[in-house]
Structures are given as C-alpha cells and as structure tokens.
Amino acid sequence: MKFQLAINMERISPDTDMAAVERHTLEMVQMADAGGFHIVWAAEHHALEMTIAPNPFQILTWWAAHTDRIRLGTAVVVAPYWHPINVAGEAALLDLYSNGRLEFGIGSGAYQREFDRMHAGLKQTDAWRYMQEMLPAIKALWQGDYAHEGEYWRFPEATSVPKPLQKPHPPIWVAARAPITYDYAVKHQCNIMSWPLTRPMSEVETYLERLQTALDENPGQSRPTFSAMRHTCVYDKKEDWMVPVEAARRQLAQFENLFKNAGGVDNGFPAMIDLSTLENRDEYDPKMLHEHLMFGTPQEIVGKLRLYDDLGVDQFTYYASLGLGMKEQKRSLELFINEVMPEFAED
C-alpha cells in the first residue's frame, strides 16, 4: 500500500498567525517527502480560512521548489470555476516546473456557499457535468490544436502552451462518490479519489462495489488506482483519543455549515453549527468518530489500515487538516512515518 498526504493551510481563528501556518504546512510536506509518501495533495477553496487554497497550482509550485521526490497532486481543480485552456496550461507548466511530478485531480466542488459566489446560480449537485465536459477538452489541448463546442465552453482552435512533460499526459484522478462518476472514471481511465467522510468501513466497501460494477459494465478497461482518504491522527497513548475527536468535531461543524449552507461566515471564518441538530448527527458521535476515522496509537492504526489493504484499497490518503495544534500534527505524522508505514513497506 502506498500513502498520500492531503494538507491545507488552515486558520481556525484570527489569532492564528498566517506566517506560522505557512511554515508549518511546508514543514509537514517536507516531512512527507523525506518519509516516503507517494503523493501530496493541494485543494482548491475560496474565501475560507479553514482551507486557504485559492489556486492549487501555485501551492504545488511552492512545494515543488522545496521537495525532491514526492509527487504533487491537485485535489481537486474545481471545474466550474475554470476555463479548459487555463487549466491545461497551468497544469502543464507545473508538470515542467516539478520535473514531471504532477498528479492531475479534477472534480466538481463541494460547498454550495462557494458556488453561490464563484458560479452564481449553479447547484452543487449539477456541477459534475462541468467536470465531465472539461476533462476531455484538457486532454485534447495537451495533445495539440483543438476546438471545442460544448454545453458550457466554446472556443476556436487552440492548444496548451506549454505541453506537459509526462507523456501522453500526467496521471489523472477524479473525486468519485456517485455511481455515474465511477463509470466515467473507468471509461476515461482516471484514477479514483474516494472520501467516505465520517462514515463506517461499509462506505468504502460500497465505493469499491461501484468501481467493480463500472468495470463489469465496461469490459476491456483496466482497473484504475483506488485511494481512500480519512482524517488521520496518530498519538502515543490510548487515553489521548479525545484530542483528535474534539478537533474533528469542531472542524466538521464548520464543514456541515458550508456543505449545507446552514450558517454564517465571518471574515472567512465559518461558524460551527450545532451537530446535534442535524439529521445525520449520529455520524458525529465521539466514539463513532474514533472508530471510523484513522485515529489511534501506531498499533491501532496499523490494524485499521490492514482492513483497507484487505479490501483492495491501493493507496491511503492521510488527511492531516482537522484543526489539531501544529505540535500534535507533526507528532502524528512522525509516528505514522516511523511506526506505521514500515509495516506496509513493499518488497
């Protein structure tokens, strides 16, 4: 099993110093690079302090200059906020700058609040259509001159300048949850990023079943790489289990606000809504969070990861950004690198 790191620059309150956040994030990425992580992912979000990522290509170019071998992924470029020519050129330039380390992840976006500001009138549930139109256009632009007449974009003949270093193009990933996205990924030979949120292991099993169904319905297509992401925190003593759980509950209260457009945002800081008022409140029970998320001592984490490995998860994504203190984040990553990853070393 290979390992990926997903990390954001995050400020939980106005008291958090941005320069310290910047330094900490880069140090975490450098730890992952030195520790043998396969990919590090940068997100795209707008006007939110909890995920400071207005342009993933800029973030990854920054990380590329300070790392040696780790691959650099967008997770994800939000298709409705971009034009295909912009994305093709930005991605190709990053691939050149990083000496061919780009992993290109594309998706449809998550928060209705962002759509209301970045693409007024678009419902989050309809945004997948933009992703499915954009990706073939980007691949064509990487190959040469191409004109596009689609539902959402139209442009005369153009090409990507520059072209990607990797041939025929960088590895492509799509964020997938719904069956239609798994079918699209298999048909277009895209790797799959899955995120079961706070749900139990059965959610991962469901995603893998959707992948198998898509493969069965598209004979002749090869199986893409399948990754699963979880909030992750490794700690020294079992009695510390509530530290990441409490941090996760605070962040998830902000996530639900943004996902459901159910609360306010003050100068970039989302309010935390009352999780007990939600229909899905059982998903945020502390003991369930401890069980379902990748929280535990090194030995406990190894046991949890064995379940993912046995299911057929190819790569696990360590989601580091859950509002923990910087010291706790670094200790967690250190324990994961030194005491967990060696148990999954490839022969």
Residue locations for each model-derived region?
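N-terminal beta1-alpha1-beta2 module of alpha/beta enzyme domains
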Residues: M1-L72, K167-P170
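Flexible, glycine-rich active-site loops centered on histidine and acidic residues
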Residues: K2-A19, P80-H148, I192-M193, T198-E205, ...
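Hydrophobic faces of well-ordered beta-strands that scaffold small-molecule active sites
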Residues: F3-I7, V40-A42, L72-T74, L102-I106, ...
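Active-site mouth loops of central-metabolism enzymes
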Residues: I7-R23, V77-I85, Q166-A176, T232-Y235, ...
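Conserved, mostly hydrophobic/aromatic
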Residues: A32, G36, E44, W63, ...
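Glycine-rich, proline-tolerant flexible connector loops at the mouths of alpha/beta enzymes
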Residues: I39-W63, V78, F115, W195-M201, ...
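Alpha-helix-loop-beta-strand connector modules within alpha/beta enzyme cores
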Residues: M50-T74, Y130-M134, L333-D347
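An alpha-helical appendage that flanks or caps ligand/catalytic pockets
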Residues: Q124-V161, S202-V313, D347
